[in-house]
Amino acid sequence: NEKNIILSGSVLVENFMDIDLTEIKLLKKVVVSNVNHSIVLDKLKENLIHFDCPIIEVISESNEELINDYSDQSTLGVDRWLAAMGAWKIYGEDLIVINAGTAITIDLIQIDQKRKAHFRGGMILPGIAISLGILNNSTNLIDTEIGQSQYPSLNTKDAVTTGILTSIQGAVNLVCKKLPSDLPILLSGGDADLIFSQSEDDWKSRIKIESDLIFEGLMSYV
C-alpha cells in the first residue's frame, strides 16, 4: 500500500533526521515546500540519497490546474502558492484565500471565460506575532501576549491586540467590498481561529476554515 507522509516546520528540521529510514522500504517521490534556507533541502537530500528517488521542490509557477498571474512568478512565496493550489483543489471556484501565519496574505482566485483558474495576487500584512514583535522591539513593551480585542481598551495588552486585529479586519473588509458579496472566503494558518472569532458578522458567514490548506496544495504535486 502506498502512503503519504507530511512533515512540517520544526518536525522537518529537527526530528526528520532522527527517523530510522531503514524502516522505509521504498520512496517513490519526495515533494518539498521550502520557504527558508537551502540548508534544509540539502540535509534532506543527504539523508534520502540511498533511496534514489526524485526530490521535487515546489516553485510558484503556473501549471495545468492554476495559472499564476504574478508579474514575476519566481517572487511569489511558495506558501501563498500552495495555499491557492489547495483552495482551488478543494473548492474549484472563485474565492478569497486568507492564510494567517507569519504573514497574513489575502489573495484572490478567479476563473476566466475559458474556465481557466487564475491566481490573481492580493495583499500581504504582518502576522500577529510579527506585529507584536515589532511593537515590542520599537517601544520596549513588556507584554507581547495576545489580549482582548475591545475598544476602548484600558490596558496596553488589549490596546495593542485591538489595533492589530482591527487592521486585519479592515484589510479583509476592503477586499470584501471590492469583490462580489457572495464570494467564499477560505481561512487557514495558525491564527485562523483567532481572526475568525474577531470577524464581522457581514462576512463571517462566508468564511470556511481549512487548517491544512497548504498541505492540500502540496498533495497536488504528489
Model-found features: residue ranges?
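Short beta-strand scaffold segments in enzyme catalytic cores
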Residues: 1, 97-98, 104-110
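Nucleotide/phosphate-binding catalytic cleft detector across ATP-hydrolyzing
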Residues: 2-95, 116-222
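Internal, active-site/partner-interface "lid" segment
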Residues: 100-102, 155-156
